[in-house]
Amino acid sequence: MLHLVPHTHWDREWYEPFQRFRLRLVDLVDGVLDRAEADPRFCFTFDGQTAMLEDYLEIRPEAEPRIKALVATGQLAVGPWRILSDEFLVSGETLVRNLEAGVDRAERFGQAMAVGYLPDEFGHAAQVPQLLRLAGFGHAAVWRGVPAAIDRHRFTWSAPDGSSVRTEYLVGGYGNAAGLFTYPDVAVAGRRLLERLEPYFGSDPVLAMYGTDHSSPVPALLEVVEEINRRQDGYRVRLGTLAGYVLDEPSGDGDDLPRWQGELRSSARANILMGVISARVGLKVACARAERLLARYAEPLQALHGTGWPGPFLELGWRRLVESSGHDSITGCGADAVADHVAVRLGEAAQLGSGLAERVAAEVAGRVPLGAVAVLNPSPFPRAGLVDLDLTVPDDWDEVALELADGRLAATQETGRSPAIVHSETLPGRRLGEL
């Protein structure tokens, strides 16, 4: 049995910038919706990310009811991620927000695909099974980074805390059947694919991922599948979604499966592109700064001291961060125009984070008596340390002492003194020549 999964792998930005790829995306999704509505046998997996459909609906907002109807019939599989992020160059919190946003959007379409699909990330962090389990997922699907010790198509992947998910190894990649329909005799090509993959699958149906980067299914897909099944009896081809295969084809008990704990970062079977770690380092620095401002400053300070929850601003900041976390975005392996766009989005996230944090600081400072000084600790633990203050004091003060709220005097040291400006004048342009 060949379980054929029509899909595409959609890099939102990579060797071309986002808007140029979106031109092709709209054509692809238009065709998928038309074909799914015309024939209930047609199904399609949207690459494990909701961003594809969000980008599409910005151009075709009237198509959302069509998408919801096809998700309800099981013909379209959407989510659970918002973006297929790199897992090592962003923080754990960014990965959490990515999954949270993706599940939320997919459920508004009808339901999120029940598989943590990670087809093209450049290796996988050790905590991914833990994250998936916390979000209610028991299954994952991966390609890059799987070590040679895994000799079956399915294995149990565990995080350091013991959380585990049943994981489908995409043998041969997310496009192992991408060229199937380019051969003169597709039935023979299908048999060769089966023979090549059977060592990993044994008696289980073979998972054939029919799709690759920015690709669409051939127009005669259903007819060709029918012809293969009619012409020969050696094997059958069944169309389905990825979730349909992973959830409906148990391969023994979990105890019988190969086990792996920790990160998946082997290059034994696929290139994990380690060079992206040091490509366009400025993007990595900007990302870390924006993450720190949102997660460590803006949100905690707003929760503790803010007078109103700035939900839309925080949501926008995280949206810009997640949009920048794509495995061809934050990695810096795309075109120069892509890097420029990523830098702008990260800058917006940092602006929102710093602005919200400073707004809280201003609110706190406004609550203290006139002449007092407010010192705000942004850390999630008590701190003692040096505080650098700029104070305005009378010229005849020889020393300055600070009294704490409990009456104790704080040790102080004056590091410098500058005279206050006592006169200023605005010079009209016509007087500049006189100076």
Language model regions located:
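Catalytic-domain carbohydrate-binding cleft regions of carbohydrate-active enzymes
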Residues: 1-378, 385, 397, 405-415, ...
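Glycine-centered coil/turn sites that cap beta-strands in beta-rich domains
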Residues: 385-393
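Catalytic core of carbohydrate-active enzymes
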Residues: 429
